[in-house]
Amino acid sequence: MLVGEAGVGKSAIVEAIVHSIINKTCPEKFYGFNVIEVSVNSMISGTKYRGEFEKKADDLIQYIESHDKLIIFIDEIHQIFGAGSCEDSGVDLSGALKPLLARDKAIFIGATTVDDYQRSFSRDSAMKRRFQPVYVREPSIQDVPKMIMSKLEELMKFHKITVSSDVLKYTTIVAKAMNSNAKNPDLTLDVLDRAMTIAEMRGCKRLSKEHVKMVFAENYKMLNTMDEEEKKVVAWHEAGHFVAMLLSSHIVDQKLILASIFPTGDANGITLFEATDKIASYDDAYIEERVGRLLAGRISQGFIRKGYDAGAISDLEIATKWLTDRIMKYGMDEEFMNISLFAVCDDQNKLILTESDKQKIMLIAKRKVDEIYKKTEKLLLENKDIIELVAGELLKEGVVTASQIKEKLKK
């Protein structure tokens, strides 16, 4: 069972399996296997009356029963629960498939989101036992180009447009900067498809960075409406977050990716991080670096401008709330531990605190934020030249990656 957010490449994994079988790069025991994709939506479509869905389900089961060496892929597999049981039809596809799953007649691969997996499979423990969940995380920006190569070749053939490795790398960076909520590899593929359509309409044979920029014309338009002073403040703000993470040594569960000053609707700029496979210790050093990173934008823009805008105010609010939550969860403070000794817990083991205790915790958090603020300010002042470098690149290009800055610092 492939479990992950929409767009992270669950179907791409199955396509890679197909290619490995065709090219015989898979384990020898899978030579000669056929991969069949089952669309639950197609099976349900038009099955209003009794017997129509049962006929489709029976045909599928008979096909599987009469063939060997099959891998059955069901995308959005959570739809099998209740599929076919609407109106006059009383058969559920999950029930129809259970005998096959019990006999291991074929290899079944399902794909769904985390929420749909938990919501649907929690209702049927027997079905849940038949699938081993494999959690699929969004690939890193560095891994996207090689991951989408086969799909990119299809797009190039369809649009009759070639894409250089330089433009491909640029697209993965810009796409994520402009739409951080969408997931790769689907995000980059969608942007490439749209950019290649633009290039094709203009009679071009090669995709350029300008074609990619046209996909995000609205973002560029919003950036161009900002005056130079406003751009500079945003650049220094994001550079602060960027450099604080660049200099960190204890935030091992996250990796710095990029910073951008392009307005995205939610904010005027963004600094992005990716999760790593490492586990954070949540000790004092880790907590201080996390809070310091949250405050760094506010501190950095203060180097060039007096007063605080909405972004700087938000930094302080988020840092204080984040630290307050961690103090309540992990302790971190002798004074808080004295408070929690006398607190009671509810049925979910959460502390029930009096208003007086809550006020004390808020004061503890504020005091610690002030301490971390001073430490982070000192660190950033000592590395102001790096902040200036990052801000300069942001003002010039709009987007800068961690690898680009690390390369410049080597020189």
Model-derived regions, located:
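Walker A/P-loop
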Residues: 1-29
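Conserved C-terminal helix/linker of AAA+ ATPases
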Residues: 32, 114-117, 163-168, 184-220, ...
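Short glycine-rich substrate-engagement loop in P-loop NTPases that contacts/grips substrate
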Residues: 36-64
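Conserved catalytic/switch belt of AAA+ P-loop NTPases
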Residues: 61-62, 74-107, 115-126
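A short helix-turn-beta junction within AAA+ P-loop NTPase domains corresponding to the substrate/partner-engaging
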Residues: 122-137
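Short conserved motifs of the RecA-like P-loop NTPase core
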Residues: 148-149, 160-179, 211, 216, ...
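AAA+ ATPase "lid" subdomain C-terminal helix
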Residues: 157-158, 173-186, 190-207, 220-225, ...
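Soluble catalytic regions of large protease machineries
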Residues: 231-238, 242-411
